[in-house]
């Protein structure tokens, strides 16, 4: 019997190419019109095209680039994480509760923190707390924590002022855990607590031997910057006993590192840390809270793997591993199960923000007819032409590789001969154009099925890729892509029903060769170029940079004085319509100048003097108005 297998549609292949289903967690997708949509509640009722949101923003006189926030996604992520732990607690009959603590360092923007807190505003028993890692963050958190469970975790190195602020938080009715990162902090806490008449709540950050893998592995292990070694932990216990303050120790904390890709590393770290908890309980410490820190990963590339940009587990598996490990070890020791805390800031915030901007121009290679070299042409050029004829008229797979290598060598020799005066400028230009044409022909003839061709094809894709000049600063909006090779999903927002027959690289508008996106999610892997529909100058070409809600804004720098982009908070109503709730305008040129201590008033004075001296009187007002418009304008490109 014959069965007909339904072939995937073109749009299904496009969806697979960009791997949207997996990295987006259902919050984004590609509809049947080839448009990228957002669905904050993961249903069709609350689904709208991102390009339609751009039109709304433009109607409000907001130029691209714009960082678009979807607060409903923040609400959904908080619910998903809490629900995963609550289910695990029920599944393992765990006799205590879970608390999700948001470290505001991940994204301190007020509208972000407010929405995270609002996600549980209607709940009687809230499962949210806040974490601060510095004095400024603590001051911000003290004013917000009453909207959550009033639990505050204080991490980071601390001075007298930081500690006094934390203790004052107790006077304000908060439950403030001062986590000791080094031994010297203990004396300071005890001294200031006595001075203020406050009973401190202490936590210990344990320096584990367990260590994860990836970009942040140095956060864990014996060489970690933070935490107390086993001998130091015992010193703290003995000191607290001597001061009759052992009851102040209420929390054990550890942190293996951000973006833990392998669930086995998570389980090993929890197993080691919960033994610290049990041992400390046996020494008389009445610890009730077990803080596993951060580490819950985001699947940036959607491959569900152990790569540093992914994770080989799901949210429910993460929760089950932590709850079951804590429960099993406590059973062995006969100790009560503690309240479990996680500081899962990246997982809460990454999905909620998308940077949307426009392509302002391209540089693309198109094959062109190249004349054969003349009889008196240098021998090097004639050799190159023979290679071109070979690849045109067909040859075997092995010869294709030889032609590629010969072309590489010949082009290098052409550059050398130009530098020594053997070849002139026309010769060099001809050699470069012919080599591109040969590369183009080789790309058509080589196959990914041939493993010897694959590395060459990758190189050819890069050489022949279109260059998309995109209106943004990599250093401001995607600093982790530059600094630590973090992968962020990138794709066009419209026209995906068309042929994705071009490949491109994204280049920003800074005057820096590092301002380029070098890694792209494609299918189940990472590539150096991205499949895209062809760019045309007669219609806008929108690009979206996804999963940028964690760390990117606060880490972004001001290279070339490109400042913060505009941002907009957008909700999707029950009719699938987008509603702009809030707009925060980005930096102007004047803002950036003042930030680097340039006296803008003096600049204006100098302008006026120069204009009065050099410009005709009837033009002076117009010229000064142009200069003033430049100072008040957006730092990104507006007219092109």
From Swiss-Prot:
The catalytic activity of this protein is classed by the Enzyme Commission as: 4.1.1.19
Any one GO MF term held by the record is:
metal ion binding
- Which cofactors does it use? Mg(2+); pyridoxal 5'-phosphate
> Gene symbol?
speA
From which organism does this entry originate? Vibrio cholerae serotype O1 (strain ATCC 39315 / El Tor Inaba N16961)
Q: Which SUPFAM superfamilies match?
A: PLP-binding barrel (SSF51419)
Task: Return the Gene3D superfamilies for the record.
Answer: 1.10.287.3440, 1.20.58.930, Alanine racemase (3.20.20.10), Lyase, Ornithine Decarboxylase, Chain A, domain 1 (2.40.37.10)
Question: What keywords appear on the UniProt entry?
Answer: Decarboxylase, Lyase, Magnesium, Metal-binding, Polyamine biosynthesis, Pyridoxal phosphate, Spermidine biosynthesis
Q: Which reaction does it catalyse?
A: L-arginine + H(+) = agmatine + CO2
- Protein family per UniProt: Belongs to the Orn/Lys/Arg decarboxylase class-II family. SpeA subfamily.
| Protein name as annotated | Biosynthetic arginine decarboxylase
| NCBIfam families reported for this sequence | PRK05354.1, speA
Q: Which residues bind substrate?
A: 290-300
Where does the source fall among the domains of life? Bacteria
Q: Which HAMAP family match?
A: SpeA
Q: What is the role of the protein in this entry?
A: Catalyzes the biosynthesis of agmatine from arginine.
Task: Write out the GO biological process terms.
Answer: arginine catabolic process; putrescine biosynthetic process from arginine; spermidine biosynthetic process
The enzyme's first-digit EC class, named in words, is: lyase
Q: Where are the N6-(pyridoxal phosphate)lysine residues found in this chain?
A: 105
């Amino acid at each position: 019997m014959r069965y007909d297998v339904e072939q995937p549609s073109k749009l299904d292949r496009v969806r697979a190419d960009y791997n949207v289903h997996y990295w987006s967690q259902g919050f984004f997708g590609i509809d049947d019109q080839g448009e990228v949509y957002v669905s904050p509640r993961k249903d069709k009722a609350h689904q709208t095209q991102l390009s339609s949101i751009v039109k709304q923003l433009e109607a409000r006189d907001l130029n691209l680039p714009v960082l678009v926030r979807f607060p409903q996604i923040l609400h959904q992520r908080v619910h998903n994480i809490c629900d995963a732990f609550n289910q695990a607690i029920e599944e393992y009959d765990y006799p205590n509760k879970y608390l999700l603590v948001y470290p505001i360092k991940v994204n301190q923007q007020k509208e972000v923190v407010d929405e995270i807190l609002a996600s549980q505003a209607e709940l009687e028993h809230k499962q949210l707390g806040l974490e601060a890692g510095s004095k400024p963050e603590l001051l911000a958190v003290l004013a917000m924590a009453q909207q959550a469970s009033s639990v505050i975790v204080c991490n980071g190195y601390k001075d007298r002022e930081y500690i006094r602020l934390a203790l004052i938080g107790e006077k304000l009715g908060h439950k403030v855990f001062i986590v000791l990162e080094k031994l010297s902090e203990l004396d300071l806490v005890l001294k200031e607590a006595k001075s203020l008449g406050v009973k401190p709540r202490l936590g210990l950050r344990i320096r584990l031997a367990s260590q994860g893998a990836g970009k942040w592995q140095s956060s864990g292990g014996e060489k970690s910057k933070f935490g107390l070694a086993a001998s130091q932990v015992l010193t703290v216990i003995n000191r607290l006993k001597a001061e009759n303050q052992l009851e102040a120790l209420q929390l054990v904390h550890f942190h293996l590192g951000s973006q833990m890709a392998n669930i086995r590393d998570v389980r090993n770290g929890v197993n080691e840390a919960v033994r610290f908890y049990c041992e400390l309980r046996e020494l008389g410490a009445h610890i009730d809270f077990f803080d596993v820190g951060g580490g819950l990963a985001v699947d940036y590339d959607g491959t569900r793997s152990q790569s540093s940009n992914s994770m080989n587990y799901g949210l429910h598996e993460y929760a089950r591993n932590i709850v079951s490990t804590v429960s099993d070890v406590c059973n062995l020791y006969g100790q009560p199960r503690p309240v479990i805390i996680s500081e899962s800031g990246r997982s809460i915030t990454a999905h909620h923000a998308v940077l949307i901007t426009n392509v302002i121009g391209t540089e693309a290679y198109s094959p062109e007819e190249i004349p054969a070299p003349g009889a008196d042409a240098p021998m090097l050029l004639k050799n190159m032409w023979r290679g071109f004829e070979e690849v045109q008229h067909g040859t075997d797979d092995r010869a294709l590789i030889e032609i590629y290598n010969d072309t590489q060598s010949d082009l290098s020799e052409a550059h050398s001969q130009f530098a020594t005066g053997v070849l002139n400028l026309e010769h060099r230009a001809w050699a470069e154009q012919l080599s591109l044409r040969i590369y183009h022909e080789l790309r058509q003839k080589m196959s990914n099925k041939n493993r010897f061709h694959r590395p060459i094809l990758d190189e050819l894709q890069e050489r022949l890729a279109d260059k998309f000049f995109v209106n943004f600063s990599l250093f401001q909006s995607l600093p982790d892509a530059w600094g630590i090779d973090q992968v962020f999903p990138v794709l066009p927002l419209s026209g995906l029903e068309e042929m994705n027959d071009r490949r491109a690289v994204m280049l920003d508008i800074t005057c820096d060769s590092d301002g380029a996106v070098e890694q792209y999610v494609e299918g189940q892997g990472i590539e150096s170029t991205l499949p895209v529909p062809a760019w045309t100058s007669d219609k806008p070409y929108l690009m979206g940079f996804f999963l940028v809600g964690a760390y990117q804004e606060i880490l972004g720098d001001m290279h070339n004085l490109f400042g913060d982009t505009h941002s907009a908070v957008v909700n999707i109503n029950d009719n699938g319509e987008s509603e702009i709730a809030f707009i925060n305008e980005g930096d102007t040129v004047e803002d950036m100048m003042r930030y680097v201590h340039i006296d803008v008033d003096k600049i204006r004075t100098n302008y006026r003097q120069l204009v009065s001296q050099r410009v005709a009187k009837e033009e002076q007002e117009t010229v000064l108005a142009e200069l003033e418009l430049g100072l008040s304008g957006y730092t990104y490109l507006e007219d092109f």
